[in-house]
């Protein structure tokens, strides 16, 4: 379907099907449409309401252009949509490190800061991790440690083609929804933090359509009503659980998992240096209780979707032990050292 027909359908207030959205995104990513047409297509898609079919179709188009990497089906991603303006430290990144120490295979897809002061790439880099390993080095790192960090610009170079247009539009489009679904390893297990409660069902259905095996879509809230794109240590967490094609909903509080509740200000983050120091202290076992328990809660969910814990409560115990026994600290050091070694070796081999 030519883009004019797609535009006509959207202008009539209709939504695009999976195939139509894929063709639309194929044309956008290949540079076949004018800037004016792309802006119109993206804006109308948003105005008409994004569907799970559209998200799945757009994802397929972008994933076909991704730099390939081969991990395995055990890999878990912990990520959020961003956009909650809560200013917390890098909880999902800390959770990935701790869950990995507990025995979860991690494929953390991330980037530098966009809506926050410090993104997952920023804090990992500050901790000493080499964030731009070539795919073959990342595969080796994963094979040795069960941990991989997949830097979005490295694996999705085609996204550069639309960066300027997205900035020009200046409002949210389907691209803002796609981020957590674009892990280049094609993970089947995820914790997806969603800041907008209205998007939870959309993510659950999109993940189902794209073959996810076990995912928890989480939306946290503080008791003051602040939305969070992560499990909340400051109030309730709404969960949609997708497991083998079936969905269930839950509303939980930290106390159900033997965790305390803490005000949002107690888990505030800051610069990359400050957030890295927070994570170091969590791993060292010297962090304030609020920081430690926020990371443990998210780690527990990763343990659950990763299949090593039978429930979140069991995952909490595993995450606690990884910290208290020193496993998390030693594991983080081993991952960082291995990434540096591989980066140096592959750099020598490419010279």
Curated annotation (Swiss-Prot):
InterPro entries linked: Anthranilate_Pribosyl_Tfrase, Glycosyl_Trfase_fam3, Glycosyl_Trfase_fam3_N_dom, Glycosyl_Trfase_fam3_N_dom_sf, Nuc_phospho_transferase
Necessary cofactors: Mg(2+)
Residues involved in anthranilate 2 binding: 166
Record-listed Mg(2+) 1 binding positions: 92, 230
Pathway: Amino-acid biosynthesis; L-tryptophan biosynthesis; L-tryptophan from chorismate: step 2/5
Residues the entry annotates as binding Mg(2+) 2: 229-230
GO biological process, alphabetically ordered: L-tryptophan biosynthetic process
Pfam families noted in UniProt: Glycos_trans_3N, Glycos_transf_3
Recorded catalytic activity of this chain's protein: N-(5-phospho-beta-D-ribosyl)anthranilate + diphosphate = 5-phospho-alpha-D-ribose 1-diphosphate + anthranilate
Residues binding anthranilate 1, per UniProt: 80, 111
A molecular function GO annotation: magnesium ion binding
Record flagged with keyword Transferase: yes
Entry binding sites for 5-phospho-alpha-D-ribose 1-diphosphate: 80, 83-84, 88, 90-93, 108-116, 120
Cofactor annotation comment: Binds 2 magnesium ions per monomer.
Family: Belongs to the anthranilate phosphoribosyltransferase family.
Subunit organization: Homodimer.
Function: Catalyzes the transfer of the phosphoribosyl group of 5-phosphorylribose-1-pyrophosphate (PRPP) to anthranilate to yield N-(5'-phosphoribosyl)-anthranilate (PRA).
Designated name of the protein: Anthranilate phosphoribosyltransferase
Organism: Chlorobium luteolum (strain DSM 273 / BCRC 81028 / 2530) (Pelodictyon luteolum)
Lineage: Bacteria, Pseudomonadati, Chlorobiota, Chlorobiia, Chlorobiales
Gene field: trpD
């Amino acid at each position: 379907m030519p883009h004019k027909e797609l535009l006509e359908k959207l202008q009539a207030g209709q939504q695009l099907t999976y195939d139509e959205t894929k063709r639309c995104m194929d044309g956008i990513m290949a540079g076949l449409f004018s800037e004016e047409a792309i802006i119109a297509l993206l804006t109308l898609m948003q105005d008409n309401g994004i569907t799970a079919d559209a998200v799945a179709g757009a994802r397929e188009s972008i994933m076909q252009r991704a730099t390939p990497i081969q991990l395995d089906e055990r890999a878990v991603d912990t990520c959020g949509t961003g956009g909650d303006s809560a200013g917390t430290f890098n909880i999902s990144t800390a959770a990935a490190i701790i869950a990995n120490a507990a025995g979860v295979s991690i494929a953390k897809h991330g980037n530098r800061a966009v809506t926050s002061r410090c993104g997952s790439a920023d804090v990992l880099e500050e901790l000493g991790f080499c964030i731009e390993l070539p795919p073959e080095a990342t595969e080796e790192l994963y094979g040795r440690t069960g941990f991989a960090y997949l830097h979005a610009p490295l694996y999705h170079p085609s996204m550069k083609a639309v960066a300027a247009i997205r900035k020009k539009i200046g409002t949210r489009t389907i691209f803002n929804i796609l981020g957590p679904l674009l892990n280049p390893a094609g993970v089947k297990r995820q914790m997806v933090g969603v800041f907008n409660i209205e998007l939870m069902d959309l993510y659950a259905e999109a993940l189902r359509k794209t073959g996810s095996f076990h995912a928890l879509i989480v939306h946290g809230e503080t008791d003051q009503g602040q939305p969070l794109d992560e499990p909340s240590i400051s109030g309730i967490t709404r969960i949609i659980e997708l497991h083998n094609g079936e969905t269930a909903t839950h509303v939980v509080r930290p106390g159900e998992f033997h965790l305390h509740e803490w005000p949002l200000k107690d888990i505030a983050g800051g610069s990359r240096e400050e957030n890295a120091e927070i994570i170091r202290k969590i791993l060292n076992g010297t962090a304030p209780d609020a920081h430690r328990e926020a990371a443990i809660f998210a780690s527990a969910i990763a343990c659950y979707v990763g299949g090593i814990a039978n429930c979140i409560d069991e995952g909490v115990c595993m995450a606690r032990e990884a910290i208290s026994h020193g496993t998390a600290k030693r594991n983080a050091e081993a991952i960082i050292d291995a990434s540096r070694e591989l980066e140096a070796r592959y750099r020598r081999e490419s010279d």
